[in-house]
Curated annotation (Swiss-Prot):
InterPro entries, per database record: Deoxyhypus_synthase_arc (IPR022899), Deoxyhypusine_synthase (IPR002773), Deoxyhypusine_synthase_sf (IPR036982), DHS-like_NAD/FAD-binding_dom (IPR029035)
Family: Belongs to the deoxyhypusine synthase family.
Active-site residue list: 285 (nucleophile)
Protein name (Swiss-Prot/TrEMBL): Probable deoxyhypusine synthase
Function per UniProt: Catalyzes the NAD-dependent oxidative cleavage of spermidine and the subsequent transfer of the butylamine moiety of spermidine to the epsilon-amino group of a specific lysine residue of the eIF-5A precursor protein to form the intermediate deoxyhypusine residue.
Catalytic reaction(s) noted: [eIF5A protein]-L-lysine + spermidine = [eIF5A protein]-deoxyhypusine + propane-1,3-diamine
Organismal lineage: Archaea, Thermoproteota, Thermoprotei, Sulfolobales, Sulfolobaceae
Transmembrane segments annotated in the record for this chain: none
EC number(s) from the headed UniProt entry: 2.5.1.46
Cofactor needs: NAD(+)
GO CC annotation, single: cytoplasm
Length: 312
């Protein structure tokens, strides 16, 4: 029988852009190699650089699983440095960011550990990341119970993005995405905010606090940003609701001008997650003349490469 302590030895660590400085020219290496997936990385890097210079509305869209990894700190740093000015993500992002901001520690594990054993040891498994029970649900519940009453005292109804700024304001962890978003006043749009521990705890506490989230105000904000921008671009990591919400709203301005997809999903099953940018063109979500690229691979490998290239 494996002891719990034997599994929870090596914590996941957040990275920042400074950790990637010595790799800033790595895309030039891929440019020389060129063949097969390397070309996608090179093309995506070039588009991303041009997008950041040219587009005034720059979306960072990603799925929550990545926030359990060291990419969390990198996302926060990209926001702090001004590369992106709006985030679209999922409810789990809030869970992981809050949990890790207030003492929750995630650990390096394996895809192959016995899950029944992990359950007995009170450890969740997220891919090869291990999340002790005490580092997740309990932490989030305590945070919401602590902070929501003082937030609700002044605001009985609040847009979700403002609520997330309020939580970000109360975070001191420099690796926090919510903290970075609050400091830079970057809206974090979470269309599925009720889907997760944070959303569930908001619902429970709302029964006692007469507190409501106004998601229509989030829609109004993203509408105003899209309609008022000259050009928009997006780095879309993964699929699902965060990908769709990003491209959905851009159809109302005749589509994104720039789009870089990082994905492992395939298009043969007709899924939104696997759909390539060219399909979005048919829906008016990406302009026919837009610059776009699809990079296939694990985001924990691809995203640091793209981020490093921004420093060159």
């Amino acid at each position: 029988m494996i002891n719990r302590e034997d599994l929870l030895k090596n914590p996941v660590e957040d990275i920042a852009l400074r950790d990637l400085e010595k790799y800033s020219d790595i895309v030039n290496v891929f440019d020389k190699i060129y063949g097969f997936s390397s070309e996608g990385i090179v093309r995506g890097s070039k588009i991303l650089k041009e997008m950041i210079k040219d587009a005034d509305l720059r979306f960072l869209s990603f799925t929550a699983n990545l926030v359990s990894t060291g990419l969390r700190g990198l996302f926060a740093d990209l926001v702090k440095r001004g590369y992106f000015n709006i985030i679209v993500t999922t409810g789990g992002t809030i869970d992981h960011d809050l949990a890790r901001s207030f003492g929750g520690v995630y650990y390096k594990g394996s895809f192959d550990i016995d899950d029944a054993m992990l359950k007995d040891l009170e450890i969740h498994r997220l891919g090869n990341v291990l999340v002790p029970f005490e580092s997740y649900g309990k932490v989030i519940e305590e945070i919401v119970r602590k902070f929501l009453p003082e937030i609700a005292k002044d605001k009985k109804e609040i847009p979700a993005y403002e609520l997330l700024w309020e939580f970000g304001k109360r975070i001191s962890d420099s690796n926090s995405i919510l903290r970075a978003a609050y400091e830079k006043k970057v809206p974090v749009i979470v269309p599925g905010i009720v889907d997760g521990s944070f959303g569930t705890n908001l619902f429970i506490q709302s029964q006692f606090l007469n507190f409501k989230i106004n998601l229509f105000e989030d829609m109004r904000l993203i509408k105003d940003l899209v309609f008022s921008c000259k050009k928009s671009g997006a780095l879309i990591i993964g699929g699902g609701i965060s990908k769709h919400h990003t491209i959905w709203w851009n159809q109302f301005k005749d589509g994104l001008d720039y789009a870089v997809y990082v994905t492992t999903a395939q298009e043969y099953d007709g899924s939104l997650s696997g759909a390539k940018p060219r399909e979005a063109i048919s829906w008016n979500k990406i302009r026919p003349n837009a610059k776009h690229a699809t990079i296939y691979g694990d985001a924990t490998i691809i995203v640091p490469i793209l981020a490093a290239s921004l420093l060159s």
